[in-house]
């Protein structure tokens, strides 16, 4: 992949998402489940947010036999504190129906993972059963982050605010983020930089729930995260394995 390719892909994702937003219509919201991502992650010494996704721009198709409800139930049985569900269709093969189906079947918080650019997507997430949403600092203005945090809170949802640098982490803190995800995958290059977790987590105060994202491939990776953050979000590792239960046990 050329150095310019990742930049182009990210721009394409944002452009596609902006066009999707224009087509969002009304919906009948699911009952509010009253589940808190923050509380769930803080209830254990170290927590796992396990992810459901069919494919990704960096890895291509991850799971041909993709059954998100079945996968999510397996995660819950294994001890996940929360579930992340990709709802982007074009680049990750997800859907809002996946979010709705998973939220309806589980008793733990479910995070809508998507490229949130507009308030209507937050209301949409709530309508389809999400307990939390992902906000990516790199693609939002400070004003948007503050506004989206406030709106999500008013709807009874938490926000996982994703950062990639210490500067982005400072911005997230200034905007009022309480759960900060440190993504070791650079969105501009799609490369993994594990040292980012140590660098950025050291910058965050103890009252912030810290989540390490991306790059978990083996037990030693997870052990590193345990020393630095409160939780890990793991997706590709599980999705690439035919036997999720065995993959989980191999990590722990």
From Swiss-Prot:
<keyword id="KW-0057">Aromatic amino acid biosynthesis</keyword>
<protein>
    <recommendedName>
        <fullName>Indole-3-glycerol phosphate synthase</fullName>
        <ecNumber>4.1.1.48</ecNumber>
    </recommendedName>
</protein>
<dbReference type="InterPro" id="IPR011060">
    <property type="entry name" value="RibuloseP-bd_barrel"/>
</dbReference>
<keyword id="KW-0210">Decarboxylase</keyword>
<dbReference type="Pfam" id="PF00218">
    <property type="entry name" value="IGPS"/>
</dbReference>
<keyword id="KW-0822">Tryptophan biosynthesis</keyword>
<dbReference type="InterPro" id="IPR045186">
    <property type="entry name" value="Indole-3-glycerol_P_synth"/>
</dbReference>
<dbReference type="InterPro" id="IPR001468">
    <property type="entry name" value="Indole-3-GlycerolPSynthase_CS"/>
</dbReference>
<keyword id="KW-0028">Amino-acid biosynthesis</keyword>
<comment type="pathway">
    <text>Amino-acid biosynthesis; L-tryptophan biosynthesis; L-tryptophan from chorismate: step 4/5.</text>
</comment>
<dbReference type="GO" id="GO:0004640">
    <property type="term" value="F:phosphoribosylanthranilate isomerase activity"/>
</dbReference>
<dbReference type="GO" id="GO:0000162">
    <property type="term" value="P:L-tryptophan biosynthetic process"/>
</dbReference>
<comment type="similarity">
    <text>Belongs to the TrpC family.</text>
</comment>
<keyword id="KW-0456">Lyase</keyword>
<dbReference type="InterPro" id="IPR013798">
    <property type="entry name" value="Indole-3-glycerol_P_synth_dom"/>
</dbReference>
<dbReference type="GO" id="GO:0004425">
    <property type="term" value="F:indole-3-glycerol-phosphate synthase activity"/>
</dbReference>
<dbReference type="InterPro" id="IPR013785">
    <property type="entry name" value="Aldolase_TIM"/>
</dbReference>
């Amino acid at each position: 992949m050329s150095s310019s390719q990742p930049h182009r892909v990210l721009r394409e994702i944002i452009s596609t998402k902006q066009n999707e937003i224009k087509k969002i219509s009304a919906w009948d919201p699911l009952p509010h489940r009253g589940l808190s991502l923050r509380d769930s992650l803080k209830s254990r010494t170290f927590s796992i947010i396990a992810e459901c996704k069919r494919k990704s721009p960096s890895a291509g198709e991850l799971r041909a036999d993709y059954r998100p409800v079945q996968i999510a139930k397996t995660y819950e049985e294994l001890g996940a504190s929360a579930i992340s569900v990709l709802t982007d269709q074009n680049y990750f093969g997800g859907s809002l129906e996946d979010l709705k189906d998973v939220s309806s079947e589980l008793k733990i918080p479910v995070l809508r993972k998507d490229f949130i650019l507009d308030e209507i997507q937050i209301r949409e997430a709530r309508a389809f059963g999400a307990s939390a949403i992902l906000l990516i600092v790199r693609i939002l203005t400070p004003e948007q982050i503050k506004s989206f945090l406030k709106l999500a809170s008013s709807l009874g949802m938490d926000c996982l605010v994703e950062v990639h640098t210490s500067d982005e982490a400072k911005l997230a803190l200034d905007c009022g983020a309480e759960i900060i995800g440190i993504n070791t995958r650079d969105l501009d290059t799609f490369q993994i930089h594990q040292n980012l977790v140590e660098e950025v987590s050291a910058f965050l105060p103890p009252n912030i729930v810290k989540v390490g994202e991306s790059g978990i491939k083996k037990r030693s990776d997870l052990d590193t995260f345990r020393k630095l953050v409160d939780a890990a979000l793991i997706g590709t590792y599980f999705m690439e394995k035919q036997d999720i239960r065995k993959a989980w046990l191999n990590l722990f």
